[in-house]
A protein has these predicted regions:
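Acidic, metal-coordinating catalytic segment for phosphate/diphosphate chemistry
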Residues: 2-30, 110-122
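Active-site donor-binding loop signature of nucleotide-sugar glycosyltransferases
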Residues: 54, 67, 158
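N-terminal strand-loop-strand
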Residues: 12-64, 92
Length: 181
């Protein structure tokens, strides 16, 4: 099959864009930390992950994946490892980049506006766009009992997660899908 110049879609020239057309995009790193541990009263281990209670808006008081803005002096992997250590007090047994989540409508203000469950842009909404590079990590079962204890960090079985801040439920679902496949 050949494509003639007449059948090629028109592309707007780059000259039409100005610096003002580009909004700010922030980069964050989050980590889905998985560990096998038994539920209370059971012998067989199941998958658990630690969540962090948000101490500020947006989503103050809700649980979220450990993470935050990428610091200028950190690599992505360093930020993911730091997040894991801060949440659990442990070094990862395994750490790998899972996916980059960059939906334009990830911001809380944008996620609030939905039609039939699908997010829609909010005209004039002033929200910062955040792209999250998500890592997944595992902690050896032998070290789970040594994890850090803190009132704003709690381990949850993956089949009993609360409603998480931001799009973190979707991120966990994707991590579990990848783990199974």
């Amino acid at each position: 099959m050949s494509i003639s110049p007449d059948s090629t879609p028109a592309v707007e020239p780059y000259d039409d864009h100005t610096e003002g057309d580009h909004s700010s995009v922030s980069l964050a790193v989050s980590t889905v930390i998985l560990a096998l541990r038994p539920k209370e009263g059971q012998q067989h281990p199941s998958l658990w992950l630690p969540l962090v209670r948000r101490l500020r808006e947006p989503y103050k008081g809700q649980w979220a994946l450990p993470g935050g803005p990428l610091q200028s002096q950190q690599s992505l992997e360093q930020a993911a490892g730091y997040t894991l250590k801060r949440a659990t007090g442990l070094e990862p047994g395994y750490l790998e980049q899972l996916y980059a989540f960059g939906d334009v409508l990830r911001a809380p203000e944008a996620r609030a506006a939905r039609i039939n469950g699908a997010p829609v842009p909010v005209p004039g909404a002033d929200h910062e766009r955040v792209v999250s590079v998500v890592y997944w990590a595992s902690i050896p079962a032998t070290e789970v009992s040594q994890t850090r204890v803190h009132e704003n960090i709690r381990w949850f079985p993956v089949d009993e997660l609360p409603e998480l801040a931001f799009d973190h439920n979707e991120i966990v679902e994707y991590a579990l899908y990848r783990l199974q496949n």
